[in-house]
Amino acid sequence: MVTSVARGRAAHSEPDYIARAEALAEGFAARAAEHDRTGSFPFENFRELSEAGLLSLTVPAVHGGAGAGARYTARVIGIIGKADPSTALVLSMHYINHLVMARSPTWPVRHSRKLARESVEGLALVNALRVEPELGSPARGGLPATVARRTETGWRLSGHKIYSTGSPILKWYLVWARTDEAEPRVGQFLVPAGLRAPASSRPGTITACAPAAAMTSSSTTS
């Protein structure tokens, strides 16, 4: 783990993730202009990040990750960001979500462990789906139009989202939605990426319809 050495280089007995990031940065920088010109997604960057163990940087050490804190992680992001800002943005979202999972009392343990394990073992990124066509950013307040309904196997979600940073490579979405209960709760629902949207979905949006989504956190609207 690197938490105890967040202010400097890793100890000799620990992997030096700063050095790993620096080793990858040159290649990222060389490819960045072409990705910008063509609008292509840097899939190869994330394969290399995964192979270097950098996708699990903020995964707790108890689950096989590096257990890095925010300060050490910021240094890694800075190195990647200087080489390819787009890659760094997607990576930072992934890191933040794992930091939240590790520290949040509302995250179901079995789900946070599953995502942690997948991030350690392979290419499994996660980010939130929050912004909607009518509401815009939830930072301004308001209830999401995306609705979650109870089923025998979990939750069924229906609604529209505009985007999620890194969506071409995400394995998991954290979908922001409200329940259809008399007193709605608002929370995040863990949904696997790759679900097919109905043909009627409006252009530029994502329709989430998950028959067995898992609710990871919630709060009442009152």
Task: Label the predicted regions.
Residues 2-75:
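Alpha-helical interface subdomain recognition
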Residues 43, 47-50, 57-160, 165:
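Glycine-rich flavin
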Residues 104-106, 151-153, 178-181, 193-196, ...:
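Short loop segments at secondary-structure junctions
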Residues 117-119, 165-166, 180-181, 207-210:
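A general structural signal for short secondary-structure junctions and capping/turn motifs
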Residues 124, 142-144, 169-171, 185, ...:
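A generic structural signal for well-ordered coil/turn residues at beta-strand boundaries
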Residues 152-156, 172, 214:
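A generic structural signal for beta-strand entry/edge sites
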Residues 160-200:
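A short core secondary-structure module
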Residues 196-222:
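Flexible, small-/acidic-enriched active-site or ligand-binding loops
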